UniProtKB/Swiss-Prot annotation:
One GO MF term: structural constituent of ribosome
Protein's GO biological process: ribosomal large subunit assembly; translation
Top-level taxonomy: Archaea, Thermoproteota, Thermoprotei, Thermofilales, Thermofilaceae
Alphabetical UniProt keywords: Ribonucleoprotein, Ribosomal protein, RNA-binding, rRNA-binding
UniProt name for this protein: Large ribosomal subunit protein uL18
The keyword Ribonucleoprotein is annotated on this UniProt entry: yes
Origin species: Thermofilum pendens (strain DSM 2475 / Hrk 5)
Length: 196
């Protein structure tokens, strides 16, 4: 494994594929709080964190399981859910006195209109100042889940068995996938009212 006397072993979190220290260093040098977006295998987390010499301090955080408190019945890792998480985390951060942040997407690839940037759009709409280009943010209809509702409508007409299989989570939670945009609007309104 070693390649000679001068071989330097990478840091542990870099070897494990968890941290890109070159990106992290540039983010920390800015001195601004970071909007940290992490989409995991079953959940998603959006945090506002500040780097200190002893480690990161989380100022505000929103976990996908928190959306249940506000009545969210949909999938907790899709574009509308990540938007709501970004919105929720930013509202909490604004209450703590944070007004601006920079985006930390970790090892996620920066794909235009992706779930990660849906969370950023949610934070922007909540009132947080984040330097980001408009070209990477998803459209409003996609954020509301209209693409999911249209797909559900098409699938319900063409293949009802597959519709029941694909949207079994929505149906068991008592949510018609075709009414996802209206459900999204009501949950966003509840978050806004709760964190005035």
């Amino acid at each position: 494994m070693a390649r000679g006397a001068r071989y330097r072993v990478p840091l542990k979190r870099r070897r494990e594929g968890k941290t890109n220290y070159y990106k992290r260093r540039k983010l920390i040098i800015s001195g601004k709080p970071r909007l940290v977006v992490r989409v995991l295998s079953r959940t998603a987390i959006v945090q506002i964190a500040k780097a200190t010499p002893k480690g990161d301090v989380v100022i505000a955080s929103a976990h996908s399981n928190e959306l249940k408190k506000y009545g969210w019945k949909g999938y907790r890792r899709n574009t509308p859910a990540l938007y709501l998480l970004g919105f929720l985390a930013a509202k909490k951060a604004l209450k703590q006195g944070v007004t601006e942040a920079i985006v930390d997407i970790g090892l996620h690839r920066p794909v235009k209109a992706s779930r990660v940037f849906a969370a950023v759009k949610g934070a922007l709409d909540a009132g947080l100042k984040i330097p980001v280009g408009d070209g990477v943010l998803p459209e409003d209809d996609r954020v509301r889940g209209e693409h999911i509702a249209n797909y559900a409508k098409m699938l319900k007409e063409s293949n009802p068995e597959l519709f029941k299989l694909r949207f079994s989570g929505y149906l068991s939670a008592g949510l018609d996938p075709e009414s996802l945009p209206e459900h999204f609007d009501s949950v966003k309104q509840k978050i806004e009212e709760a964190l005035q």
